[in-house]
Amino acid sequence: MINLFLFCRAGYEKDCAAEIQVRAAELDIGGFVKTNTNDAYVIFQCFQAGDAEVLAKNISLDSLIFARQMFAAKELLKGLPEQDRISPIVEALTQVNKAGELRVETPDTNEAKERSNFCRKFTVPLRQALKKSGALLEKENPKRPIIHVCFVASGQAYVGYSLSNNSSPYFMGIPRLKIAADAPSRSTLKLDEAFIHFIPKEEQETRLSSGMKAVDLGACPGGWTYQLVRRGMFVAAVDNGPMDQGLMDTGQVKHYQADGFRFEPPRKNITWLVCDMIEKPSRVAELIEAWAINGWFKESIFNLKLPMKARYKEVSTILATMEEILKENGVDDFSIAAKHLYHDRDEVTVHLCLRPSQPW
């Protein structure tokens, strides 16, 4: 296959494109990007046939900041006839053998969502045809490749596959989360998604456990504090503004009316530091660096607000600088990852874990 198809947020195509060009070059794979603003996807077309599979295998999806999902794809199928869209798709997937799942998707745009009903109905007959051809197993198998059919326009689709161990478990790479009725703000979904994304499911009980101490910088009105409280943690909520009364009534929150940039925790046995402040990303990064150098937390999730242009370059520079500063100050054992999550808008979410080699 010659194309790598990447889902992203509408308006972030240039950032996703810039990132995949850098990552492909690191693997000495040549190609060029094809994208349009607000299409919510990027195509990286390789110069050599078969290189798309190399990228899909060797670039970790989790290591990409702006891509929600990716798959190796054939050339765009155009003019799929209304009377028989299935045959051309089955023919295009002849090199795929015994896949474990089928996903018929669209990009995440308002226009594309109008095709979602069609995609659901079309999935059933297409699944049967792919089983008959041998491209798809009779029963779903989470260890086998995933077939993707993405309709980018009426009668136009990219088809291909992703590897189950390097793929989002969600359609279009979008987790469907519901906001709780008593949550103080919609921002609560950002931290909920961040925990799901950055902390493996089998480790969540250990790393997000009841009784842990946490600090939320810039907490008002309590959207992020809410996620910590509902997991049984005790939270120092730092903000000059008022906190949600329901959170305060739990007895798990102590409100410090202070500037998050000047606050020093009275106790240093903190497992989680979280921060979602509207501030220059470099200043937030410097704040987290200071806490890390002082050894005041074990893990942190924080948001970096993005500039209007050159967002990939800005984030990459900030993360590289953070790694350099931590190492210069004797913090050598750490891991850092960033993702433009579905519930993020003009920001990216970063996870920093200190001493990941040590048990929790």
Curated annotation (Swiss-Prot):
TM segment ranges: none
Subcellular location: Cytoplasm
Residues spanning the signal sequence: none
Domain of life, per lineage: Bacteria
Catalyzed chemical reaction(s): cytidine(2498) in 23S rRNA + S-adenosyl-L-methionine = 2'-O-methylcytidine(2498) in 23S rRNA + S-adenosyl-L-homocysteine + H(+)
Record-level GO BP terms: methylation; rRNA processing
Residues that bind S-adenosyl-L-methionine: S187, C220, P221, G222, G223, D239, D259, D276
Pfam families associated with the record: FtsJ, RlmM_FDX, RLMM_N
Active site: K305 (proton acceptor)
EC number: 2.1.1.186
Chief location of this protein within or outside the cell: cytoplasm
GO annotations of cellular component type: cytoplasm
InterPro entries: RlmM_FDX, RlmM_THUMP-like, RNA_MeTrfase_FtsJ_dom, rRNA_MeTrfase_M, SAM-dependent_MTases_sf
Similarity remark: Belongs to the class I-like SAM-binding methyltransferase superfamily. RNA methyltransferase RlmE family. RlmM subfamily.
Subunit architecture: Monomer.
PANTHER family: RIBOSOMAL RNA LARGE SUBUNIT METHYLTRANSFERASE M, RIBOSOMAL RNA METHYLTRANSFERASE FTSJ DOMAIN-CONTAINING PROTEIN
Record protein name field: Ribosomal RNA large subunit methyltransferase M
